[in-house]
Amino acid sequence: SGHGCSLVIADLPGVGESRDRDAEYEALYRDILPELDLVLWLIKADDRALSVDEYFWRHILHRGHQQVLFVVTQADKTEPCHEWDMAGIQPSPAQAQNIREKTDAVFRLFRPVHPVVAVSARTGWELDTLVSALMTALPDHAASPLMTRLQDELRTESVRSQAREQFTGAVDRIFDTAESVCIASVARTV
């Protein structure tokens, strides 16, 4: 890494493939989730079947709900998909309304701590919003490694500011902890 910090991204298998696989994945999720700083729960914009996602949320993920950021993906495929403005890299008004309805529906269903973000990786639409949401959702110690690996166009001033604030917060906590340990040690000696 060279910066003294690291970023590990793990792509876990999605749910809903089969009952046998879901049971296997449930065990995997229970084992690995406590080790993660953040889970990006991806839901395709045109996917209406969310019952398996809902089951996993309620029974596995909800305990660590502050660690989950829901992302509606493939926003450019939202109906009417032929209306996507490729030149302006944005949805048509009808698509924008449908995307809002989808993110609202995901929010109502899962009631996450963090806002639901919609993106189109193919077109780059709202990736900066996703990065900002990631910076907000990640614990302070994990935001700095993300910042160092972002493409320049995603390092907006807002993201840079968030990274500075989170780094300062992490350093402050380290000093507070060190000070508490020193005070406790002195108190025991006296």
Language-model segments: residues:
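Inter-motif core of Ras-like GTPase G domains
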Residues: 20-47, 56-67
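Conserved beta-strand segments of the P-loop GTPase G domain that flank and frequently precede/overlap
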Residues: 40-45, 70-73, 118-120
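Short amphipathic alpha-helical segments
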Residues: 21-22, 52-55, 82-84
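Switch II (G3) loop of P-loop NTPases
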Residues: 2-25
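P-loop NTP-binding site
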Residues: 119, 131-138, 151-190
